[in-house]
């Protein structure tokens, strides 16, 4: 369920909204279980969101705004609620909701010829779902099972500055652009425990996985991962774009856009060998590879016309106009 409140008077507008939900997970498995034990227990996670914001118009051209929000959402089904969702009904005793806290402060400018927004943001992620696994082998080196580890307490901090604008120097020309620079880093040393494909806790003795005395018992095998300060990968942390659209005639429009991507890092991954060599230790993860910066430019055009009295649009796009391949 959800609800929201809004306030709007004179130069000030504000809102407050919230919601609450229940996510229930269960699985039914007749491949690894008999009929009596095919259905797992149901695990429930209560999630909620709270967010609010305000905008104040200083005058007809300038405004300032602020927004804040908090989200608590259920962990993923696989590697979160269940230890081995493909083969086991065993639930993860350490599964917790993922949490996100975020706020932003901003300034806006509006005029007939120029519009711009500038904002700073700070977002914190807590308890992100993350899992990895390693082979369990017999004396001959043959794989007999998989040991899965569910990392707990994977946190990250995203913060940065964003600017976007639209300029209309002439009636027939629109110029738009944006710039964003961020500082996104992992910010914790999560720890995870090993379980086999049936969800049983594992110990590590004499170079082999064996059954542990209990979940999170002193002999329950684990790995801690030192991610503090490691760059978040998979998305450029510096981006910029510049484009223009020209209205050649009432029917014809031509546009050109260029986008720059910088400070993009490869995403970190836990290899099986990393887990094997660091059981009951702390694995220190170095900053990942920084992908070379790149840019790409696109050309687009559209033409409006009528066919039998019906409005029609013919449009086309040339992606990567300069055939960049970095």
Where on the chain are the PLM-derived regions?
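Signature of Gram-negative outer-membrane beta-barrel scaffolds
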Residues: 1-62, 79, 84-85, 191
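Extracellular loop and loop/strand-boundary signature of outer-membrane beta-barrel proteins
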Residues: 1-3, 32-41, 87-93, 102, ...
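Outer-membrane beta-barrel channels and translocator barrels
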Residues: 9-12, 57-61, 100, 110-114, ...
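Surface-exposed extracellular loop regions of Gram-negative outer-membrane beta-barrel proteins
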Residues: 24-31, 58-103, 115, 120-152, ...
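Gram-negative outer-membrane beta-barrel transporters
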Residues: 122-124, 149-270
């Amino acid at each position: 369920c959800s609800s929201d409140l809004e306030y709007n008077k004179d130069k000030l507008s504000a809102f407050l909204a919230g919601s609450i939900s229940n996510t229930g997970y269960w699985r039914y498995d007749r491949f690894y279980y008999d009929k009596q034990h095919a259905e797992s227990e149901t695990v429930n996670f209560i999630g909620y969101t709270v967010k609010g914001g305000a905008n104040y118009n200083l005058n007809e051209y300038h405004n300032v705004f602020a927004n804040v929000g908090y989200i608590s959402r259920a962990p993923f089904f696989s590697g979160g609620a269940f230890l081995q969702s493909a083969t086991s009904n065993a639930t993860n005793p350490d599964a917790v909701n993922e949490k996100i806290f975020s706020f932003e402060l901003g300034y806006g400018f509006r005029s007939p010829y120029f519009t711009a927004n500038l904002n700073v943001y700070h977002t914190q992620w807590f308890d992100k779902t993350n899992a990895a696994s390693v082979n369990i082998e017999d004396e001959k080196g043959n794989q007999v099972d998989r040991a899965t580890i569910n990392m707990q307490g994977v946190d990250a901090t995203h913060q940065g500055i964003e600017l976007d604008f639209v300029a209309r120097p002439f009636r027939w020309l629109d110029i738009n652009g944006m710039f964003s620079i961020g500082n996104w880093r992992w910010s914790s040393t999560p720890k995870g425990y090993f379980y086999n494909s049936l969800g049983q806790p594992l110990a590590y003795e004499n170079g082999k996985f064996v059954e542990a005395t209990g979940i999170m018992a002193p002999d329950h095998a684990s790995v801690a991962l030192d991610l503090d300060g490691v760059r978040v990968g998979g998305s450029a942390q510096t981006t910029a774009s510049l484009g223009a659209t020209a209205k050649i005639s009432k029917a014809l429009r031509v546009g050109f856009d260029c986008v720059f991507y910088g400070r993009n890092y490869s995403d970190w991954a836990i290899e099986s060998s990393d887990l094997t060599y660091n059981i009951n230790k702390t694995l220190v993860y170095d900053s990942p590879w920084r992908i070379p910066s790149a840019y790409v430019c696109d050309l687009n055009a559209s033409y409006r016309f009528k066919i039998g009295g019906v409005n029609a649009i013919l449009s086309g796009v040339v992606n990567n106009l300069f055939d960049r391949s970095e």
